[in-house]
Amino acid sequence: MPGGGPVLSAARGALAGRLETAGLVVLFGFTAMAVVGYAVFGRDPSRLAGMPAWTAAFYARSFGFFALGHVWLAMTVLGAVLAVRVGWRWLAAFVPLYLISLGSELAGTTWGIPFGAYRYSALLSPMWLDRVPVVIPMSWFFMALPSYALAARASSSAWARVGLASLILLAWDLALDPAMSYATRYWVWADTGPYYGMPWLNLFGWYVTGVVLMAVLAALRAEEWTSRISLRWWALFYGANLVMPLGMCAAAGLWGAVVATLAVLAILTVPLLRAGRLAGWSGSTGSGGQ
């Protein structure tokens, strides 16, 4: 339902703008702290020698803390911005996307389909059925939504939108998997492959899962409310979540993953830049509603 008058609408718009900015600042700040910590201490724990005892104790928990904390923080930022900008309509998308991605992950960790055989480590606990961390389907949602929102501005065709959004989502995994399963061990592959130990089947599984998620968003006409948030904010939110694995890859010297991710995104950015010039990077179609 509409906001309730121009004054209330303007106030909600101002609040949303401040919330969007603050959320990105906090998310980028947390990400920077995590990446620097990994680069300094994660790659060389001997640097902890001679430091206060609490530092070593914190380091022992930091791998789980920063990974889990980043997911919860990103979800909180996105949920807060969506609540102010669009009300609670986004929950109708969150529930099916969470359940679909959970089902896909359960199939992967049980039967090796559609990603290949792998398992999650206890670093990301708690887990559903001792197989899939609770936060993993959340991360699928908060990266699928900006991917769809960006693609929706670049194409008016539902099929093109679904295909492009799935590729934008897939680009994230080109950095995520090397960072989380090769440089570190948040999950471990039983099936292996040439791309930092990841099987090629994983990319296929990611794309197929992405297509299903984007098709659900298209069926729900999510573009009607994601368009209330500016193209620039969606791009920055996506980037804030990409910086974590990309920075970890750089710190670990996995430059192939860095180059591959940036190269794919550079190609995908062409239609997005065109959309940005036409629609205005900071423009949105509304300030609130439910």
Spans of features found by a protein language model:
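Aromatic-rich, lipid-facing transmembrane alpha helices and their immediate juxtamembrane interface loops
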Residues: P2-Q290
